[in-house]
Design a protein with these regions (language model features):
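Conserved helix-turn-beta segment immediately C-terminal to the redox Cys motif
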Residues: 19-21, 36-56
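Conserved redox-active cysteine motifs that mediate thiol-disulfide chemistry
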Residues: 26-39
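A short beta-strand-turn-helix
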Residues: 4-22, 62
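Short pre-active-site segment immediately N-terminal to redox-active cysteine/selenocysteine motifs
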Residues: 20, 27-30, 72
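Non-catalytic, surface beta->alpha helical segment in thiol-disulfide oxidoreductase systems
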Residues: 77-106
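Conserved Rossmann-like nucleotide-binding pocket used by diverse enzymes
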Residues: 2, 27, 52-54
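Structural micro-motif
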Residues: 62, 68-79
Length: 106
């Protein structure tokens, strides 16, 4: 499954309040660890079709990053029913996989 970008604060709110289970990768183009873990995130999206996988470029969509309190990149946050469920800060594949397993079974 292709991971698509969230392009507005409104789109972000619609997505997290849609009732879907969502995992968002908050990243930046200049972030080396973000580029390293991106293929892992893509692969996990293929393996978990019941979870919506999206990305937010924090430089382009700073309002979203500010709203959820992003302090470092990459940060992965899971949402369900409009609420934050969990987050992983840093390019840690094992922790990311655990976050996705947890939201997939929520």
């Amino acid at each position: 499954m292709t991971v698509t970008a969230i392009n507005s604060l409104e789109e972000f709110h619609e997505l997290i309040n849609s009732g879907k289970r969502v995992v968002i990768d908050f990243w930046a183009t200049w972030c080396g660890p973000c580029r390293v873990i991106s293929p892992v995130f893509e692969k996990l999206s293929d393996a978990n079709p019941d979870v919506e996988f999206r990305k937010v470029d924090v430089d382009e969509q700073s309002a979203i990053g500010e709203e959820v309190g992003i302090r470092a990149m990459p940060t992965f946050i899971s949402f369900k029913d409009g609420k934050k469920v969990d987050e992983v800060v840093g390019a840690n594949p094992a922790n990311l996989e655990n976050l996705i397993k947890a939201i997939a079974s929520a």
